[in-house]
Amino acid sequence: QIGVCYGMMGNNLPSANEVINLYRSNNIRRMRLYDPNQAALQALRNSGIELILGVPNSDLQGLATNADTARQWVQRNVLNFWPSVKIKYIAVGNEVSPVGGSSWYAQYVLPAVQNVYQAVRAQGLHDQIKVSTAIDMTLIGNSYPPSQGSFRGDVRSYLDPIIGYLLYASAPLHVNVYPYFSYSGNPRDISLPYALFTSPNVVVRDGQYGYQNLFDAMLDSVHAAIDNTRIGYVEVVVSESGWPSDGGFGATYDNARVYLDNLVRRAGRGSPRRPSKPTETYIFAMFDENQKSPEIEKHFGLFKPSKEKKYPFGFGAQRMQRLLLMSSMQHIPLRVTCKLEPSSQSLL
């Protein structure tokens, strides 16, 4: 259930072929790509890596206002690579909001989603490739307690029709979830262990649900917000989550290592509100990207541009090998691997 976002805002990053080989050698089987970079798509052929293919915000107007443009986009970036590239989702726009700096794009998100979906449907691929958009947590008006989660009143006219269309298209809503920003913005009320998945006990009791970590609480506030629209049941994909190693309050190597390790350990689990629905999650990001701003955005990578790992943990088979080694060195039975590593298939 774990993937990694492949951003390219750096002038010192490896080639696309090197990056895809790095994904494969580290058993990372899912990727989010923010635009249809042709070199990356070519490198992904026959890799077995499942893909979220992004539509940049700058392309939304053209796709929204002209169905032919959407058909051409799908032909060029989807059909030309399918099925050797396993495109699972198309994310039409990222973190667009009707309030704030991206408000101009908001008018185009739903019609762009509709036109891209219809272009995919015309090829009979709408069951294999789901069309959605990615939002951030600023669209949540109330998140505490999680069961009272709701979207902001001034975004409902924008978001409700999108959720309705996702319900019609049987597609999940993509949400970028960052406990780091919640913690760094309010360290007085949010403890670091709660943000890092290391709290030993329930921190927030919300009726029948108990929360030991902020990630689950934030995720369930989104689930509740969707439920509280009374539109219908729409699943959630966590399309970004990460922790920076430098550049801001609480942004340290150790905090990032602990958060990311625990996020990977969480793979295959649901949330208290939806325990039977494993949460598909994408870590932001593959590399530190030196052309991003502000400064903190430069430090989210799992890898350095040199392809050296920043943190000593792995995915899938790598994690199992590490646990077996630790078990043999310590002469203890490996009794917890089913919890740390739900199954090799769950990390595909």
From Swiss-Prot:
It catalyses: Hydrolysis of (1->3)-beta-D-glucosidic linkages in (1->3)-beta-D-glucans. Keywords: Glycosidase, Hydrolase, Plant defense, Pyrrolidone carboxylic acid, Vacuole. It comes from the Eukaryota. Its main location: other. One of its GO terms (cellular component) is vacuole. Gene3D superfamilies: Glycosidases. Residues 317-348 form a propeptide. InterPro entries: Glyco_hydro_17 (IPR000490), Glyco_hydro_17_plant (IPR044965), Glycoside_hydrolase_SF (IPR017853). Induction: By fungal elicitor. The keyword Ribosomal protein does not apply. Pfam families: Glyco_hydro_17. Its EC number is 3.2.1.39. GO terms for biological process: carbohydrate metabolic process; defense response. It is found in: Vacuole. The keyword Hydrolase applies. Belongs to the glycosyl hydrolase 17 family. Implicated in the defense of plants against pathogens. This is Glucan endo-1,3-beta-glucosidase, basic isoform. It comes from Phaseolus vulgaris (Kidney bean).
